[in-house]
Amino acid sequence: MSDVFNSPQARSTISAAFGIKPTAGQDVEELLIPKVWVPPEDPLASPSRLAKFLRENGYKVLQPRSLPENEEYETDQILPDLAWMRQIEGAVLKPTLSLPIGDQEYFPKYYPTHRPSKEKPNAYPPDIALLKQMIYLFLQVPEANEGLKDEVTLLTQNIRDKAYGSGTYMGQANRLVAMKEVATGRNPNKDPLKLGYTFESIAQLLDITLPVGPPGEDDKPWVPLTRVPSRMLVLTGDVDGDFEVEDYLPKINLKSSSGLPYVGRTKGETIGEMIAISNQFLRELSTLLKQGAGTKGSNKKKLLSMLSDYWYLSCGLLFPKAERYDKSTWLTKTRNIWSAPSPTHLMISMITWPVMSNSPNNVLNIEGCPSLYKFNPFRGGLNRIVEWILAPEEPKALVYADNIYIVHSNTWYSIDLEKGEANCTRQHMQAAMYYILTRGWSDNGDPMFNQTWATFAMNIAPALVVDSSCLIMNLQIKTYGQGSGNAATFINNHLLSTLVLDQWNLMRQPRPDSEEFKSIEDKLGINFKIERSIDDIRGKLRQLVLLAQPGYLSGGVEPEQSSPTVELDLLGWSATYSKDLGIYVPVLDKERLFCSAAYPKGVENKSLKSKVGIEQAYKVVRYEALRLVGGWNYPLLNKACKNNAGAARRHLEAKGFPLDEFLAEWSELSEFGEAFEGFNIKLTVTSESLAELNKPVPPKPPNVNRPVNTGGLKAVSNALKTGRYRNEAGLSGLVLLATARSRLQDAVKAKAEAEKLHKSKPDDPDADWFERSETLSDLLEKADIASKVAHSALVETSDALEAVQSTSVYTPKYPEVKNPQTASNPVVGLHLPAKRATGVQAALLGAGTSRPMGMEAPTRSKNAVKMAKRRQRQKESRQ
């Protein structure tokens, strides 16, 4: 293959096929194979230039807030609940915890890594070896058809026009400005309660579009949401003998960033600190609520003061998302991830994950449900969707997060919320938390949560992640909408899309390309755009049956010509047809597939990166995964991936590396591993393995707390409008609204109604006590008082979190960082005495030690003394 471009015949064939006309002295290879791309210099790679750009675009730069330096304390003293974990071999808890309790404070800094860059242009090189292999195979076909030529052309274009990497500061800044424009510009965000919705009416809609069940499983019920994180790990037995640990903490990616106050470290490295800070936050909140915090006077001030101490829980790191970006927009488009502080992520995940992870409910297993949550296109999943499209009834819709799919007038519409996270308000997230608590954390209508968690979910969590703040370089800046990537991102986006569909139903389902449909943007303050429309969708899908070509799933042979596809853009998947299985099967959208083939992401798992031979193992996994997700349908791509995977396998075998051991972790090495989660996939593509992967199986049984209205969203939307829809979750809803507030006195009426309903429940668990409930309109009228209280409390919480930031534009006065790319993380500098409430301070010491000179040591900051006194009073009250 080394001579692929050198022979006169090859030069002639390539020149003719791809329209290349080399001049004298030019090499065909030089013209066909893109050269190494050097990104343009980032014009905003300094704090002052970034701040100036943001100010010029009307973006708010906040006055910086400082953090206490971290100090070391013994883990067993801070987390006595988990002392037993330190005795277990391989325990994840370190002997000491590093906590933000120091006497000196600093301004936190975060310098993300942007690669490739002008200095390191080849950080993520394209797969030139794959391209050369495809060109070589192309030359072996005597009469190559247009389809084969298109494969080479598409891969070449992706290598030439795109690049994989994490963008630029300027790209991140442009994204921030664009998010602000969505939130405040053409259709500014609107709170749902001001539009006539209530938390309960939104919940009734989500009952259809995102039905959920209780946390845990039938044989292993979850513990109620009444504990601090450290008590979610339950030890049974003796660590010196037989023991068992019941883990009720949410699944968390321990390799991801820990966020403030641990810049540059992962959640796995700070798991003890994450639990300790979350523990203390919830315990302080609980204590203040028991004291009547939120009522007028000193108790209310204590709560707001406590929230100010934890300001950093609402400040995420502005992390650049690595993607395959267009080179032409390298300086203007970089997606941002709001990397949440790990305690914030943990506490919100404790609310959402136990419910959502055990709710595999979607269009495949519940009649009338339009949700694509936990949808997988394999094992017959995509075929079920195509059958749904082919059915004559319409209009109809599907929904997943910020994606909406509508079939109307035999036309398929793929609709995305425009910069979906930017459309979210704190009140939207309140409604989402209300839904998860009342529908998920509910046992036959009885709440499985306490006042502390209700208050956190309804009044505090939304303020932490929506319209909060973020850190980049030494700048603390405003965020508009929700921080992308927080633990409630999915459900918040899904709620926004549900409201769009609700309005569509109330309008009697107009065409998505009509002005009437477009008017929903203005009414809701939610922006969206039609990403793709396919007319005569049924005809095009039926044509796939007639045009299917021989291949792995149509004859059991390697393809010589690709079968046609219909690019539905269904969560990135297209449809093609298998004659052998007699069903429609998924292939990745062609553009996305060839873009993925053009640019490898490389080994992203740091723990695997250091293994000898891992690069060759990655090649095996990458090439076989590309075939599994759709490369099998494209002759040149399939054969090239197969050959390159085989070469990597032989290399590993010749060196004596344990191939089976590497491939056992293949899902960790593949960007597509999540698509095959739960499948026993043999990572060698054959007709048999593809047939097994796509063979239809019955969908998982649904897990819901109560039956879903089979009339679908349209029926519920209309019933809500008339007030005739019966509320079957009145008790838990009213209890939540009665407890999730900071001003207790204002919620007395709502609480009394909740207690009245609770007492009316008969002892017989099978009795239909819900028949005694009022119509929805009556119920919502009584809940309205508490709804207003919850909203008011959220505003107060937000003000407390922002109390130490400037209300005007701030011009940073820090020294220039000459080369941000080489700046270390974290940069701890600009030390100053602690003068105000900024951080946990000594609050955590109530569980362990105090300073040698006592809690009033003269070297302590005033705030540290205050927090230590608070802990001491709480400790004495428990004795």
From Swiss-Prot:
The keyword Phosphoprotein applies. GO terms for cellular component: virion component. Residues 398-598 form the RdRp catalytic domain. GO terms for molecular function: GTP binding; RNA-directed RNA polymerase activity. The keyword Transferase applies. It catalyses: RNA(n) + a ribonucleoside 5'-triphosphate = RNA(n+1) + diphosphate. It is an enzyme of class 2 (transferase). Residues 846-879 are annotated as: Disordered. GTP binds at residues 259-266. GO terms for biological process: viral genome replication. Keywords: Covalent protein-RNA linkage, GTP-binding, Nucleotide-binding, Nucleotidyltransferase, Phosphoprotein, RNA-directed RNA polymerase, Transferase, Viral RNA replication, Virion. Its main location: virion. It comes from the Viruses. PROSITE patterns: RDRP_DSRNA_BIR. Pfam families: Birna_RdRp_C, Birna_RdRp_palm, Birna_VP1_thumb. May exist in multiple phosphorylated forms. InterPro entries: Avibirnavurs_RdRp_C_sf, Birnavirus_RdRp_C, Birnavirus_RdRp_palm, Birnavirus_RdRp_palm_sf, Birnavirus_RdRp_thumb, Birnavirus_RdRp_thumb_sf, DNA/RNA_pol_sf. It is found in: Virion. Its EC number is 2.7.7.48. Interacts with VP3 in the cytoplasm. RNA-dependent RNA polymerase which is found both free and covalently attached to the genomic RNA. May also contain guanylyl and methyl transferase activities. This is RNA-directed RNA polymerase. It comes from Avian infectious bursal disease virus (strain Chicken/Cuba/Soroa/1998) (IBDV). The lineage of its organism: Viruses, Riboviria, Orthornavirae, Birnaviridae, Avibirnavirus. The gene is VP1.
